[in-house]
Amino acid sequence: MILVLLGTQDKPFLRLLKMVSKEIDKGNIKEKVVAQTGYTAFSDKNIESFDFKNKEEIEKLIDKARLIITHAGVGTITECLEKGKKIIVVPRLKKYLEHTNDHQMQITKEFEMKGYVIALYDKSRLSAALDKIKTFKPKKYESNSENFRMKIKDYIDNI
């Protein structure tokens, strides 16, 4: 199953959903696709979609997914990486009114440069990213949360 995640941003991100729909129509995606559409009005007979679910339900979907296609939300990306998922990241862009600025572009570039994700930029094609993801081996993601907790504990212990 492919899981598409648009996050909770209150601006629509129809561009990503249309890309996925187009690849289904072309036969490049043959498996089940589930999409969390958030505030994006969208309907497609080939995509099972919902606007929002609670955290536990999203985690179950992430666990079931073979591939994640997502916006460049740091929380979404890191959660999927921690679960060892292959991820295609498509940043929301200001010029399409998908966000208020282009910070998702920088986030995407950072995760891509570190070898964690396949990035899909404005002019690139989803079909190429789908081909690339087949052989892509993402770098293992190590969260800094535990390290941060240990530093706080050490600090408190030494007060």
Predicted regions and their residues:
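Catalytic binding pocket for nucleotide-activated donors in carbohydrate/polymer assembly enzymes
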Residues: 86-121
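Donor-nucleotide binding loops and adjacent catalytic segments primarily
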Residues: 1-64, 105
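C-terminal amphipathic helix plus adjacent low-complexity
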Residues: 132-159
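Short, well-ordered alpha-helical microsegments
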Residues: 13, 76-78, 127
